[in-house]
UniProtKB/Swiss-Prot annotation:
Organism name: Corynebacterium glutamicum (strain ATCC 13032 / DSM 20300 / JCM 1318 / BCRC 11384 / CCUG 27702 / LMG 3730 / NBRC 12168 / NCIMB 10025 / NRRL B-2784 / 534)
Coiled-coil regions listed: none
Record protein name field: Urease accessory protein UreD
GO molecular function: nickel cation binding
GO CC entries: cytoplasm
Domain of life assignment: Bacteria
Annotated compartments: Cytoplasm
Role according to the record: Probably acts in the maturation of urease via the functional incorporation of the urease nickel metallocenter. Required for urease expression.
Amino acid sequence: MTQTQPVGTLRLTIDDQGPQGQSRAVEQFHQGALRVIRPHYLDDSGQVCYTIIAIGGGYLGGDVYEQQFTIKDNAKALITTQSATKIYRTPQGPATQHTEINVGENAVLEYLADQTIAYREATYHQFTKVALHPSATFVMSEQITPGWHPDGKHFAYDEMRLHTEITDSTTGRLVLLDNLLLRPDSREGSFGWTEQYTHSGQMIVMGEGVDKQLVAELNEQLAAHPDVYGAVNFLSAPGTLLRGFIARTLSNRTEELINLHEHIASLLRGRWRGQEPVNLRKY
């Protein structure tokens, strides 16, 4: 991780040795502007749910945040946020978040964050490194929303960079290296970039249940969606059994992207583990 003193640090290690096989945190550390709410269980599957709170109110220029999540063999966790992550003006340099994730054998992590709102003259760099056992299930969704501007301008932020690496923890094999870079001022208009849309999203899913038939099914659902434009692509790599998909989505409303991502997460948890749909009970 970074050598700069972080504004907020959070570490969670989760195993499956709680009462009646429930997953639980065996290591929990927080410092500075990051906290977690007391864990709760959304159903009787034993999956533990943690909610992250950023108590500073928003990310500022030069801020660095660090997160580390370890899900041990057979454990199941859902990690979410209490509210949107807000990136304000960053004249001192980019706001940065580093996240390291390790998901063990037959373990599950659903990382379903609220939207990231980038305001005028904001630069945000996010680096996420994920190591997965081939039998693990990993779901991550993100939404990027342009913040309010007094002139009504939609894309007033300077830069958003979301860098994601996924590797096979048993072989070290790289499965995904994704670098989503949004620089509105480098584009003349929206044609060929976001077209008429203002909000963007991405969802990454890795799991043994992913195949090309599932990807085709999700693409059909996306094509029929009246308010979201996007595509789903299959992920695999030689030298590893890991496989998954990445979905890129565009819309004009944050809620449409969040609802779509939660629909996909609910569809997969029902098929793969017989769990109820996602219900984060935030509002």
